[in-house]
Amino acid sequence: LVEILVAVMVFSIISTISAGVFVSELRNQRKSLASQELFDQTSYLMEYMSRAIRMAKKDDLEGINCLSGDKVNYEIIAGQGIKFRNYKDECQRFYLENFQLKEEKGGGVSDLTSVPLRVLNFNTNLIGETQTDNLQPRVTFFLEIESKEATKIKIQTTISQRNPDIER
């Protein structure tokens, strides 16, 4: 009787430890997958936005007034977005709304981030956005994004406009 009791107790301890390790590994796997999703989506987002901003044109066409100034390259909107004329001569805007990064282009609005991700911060900084400053336009943008597993990433990049900023 004592031997059976000891055997059951040892089996219970080993089973409990094994189950704990298994649950811990599942939790780590879920966190790892959430981090990978966060990195993948953030990488895509940075590449997409960088390309669009790099290919922007000066707002100097008759009849197309995307920006409030004359011959301006970019414009910061309400501290949480950037607006410009893209290479297809459409007004394009990236902005933060309800923890989601959105894009407005050609009259339509689309989400750039998926629902499980929350954009906590989106800041932009402009250098050389006007024609008269003799600087090639540069945009720095900063993103802080959090996944549903509470993994956060902070990332910043600076892009210069592809087209030379010369007077015409």
Residues covered by each model-derived region:
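Short, cationic motifs built from Arg/Lys/His that form the positively charged side of catalytic pockets
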Residues: 43, 54, 100-103, 162
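Type IV pilin-like appendage domain
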Residues: 62-131
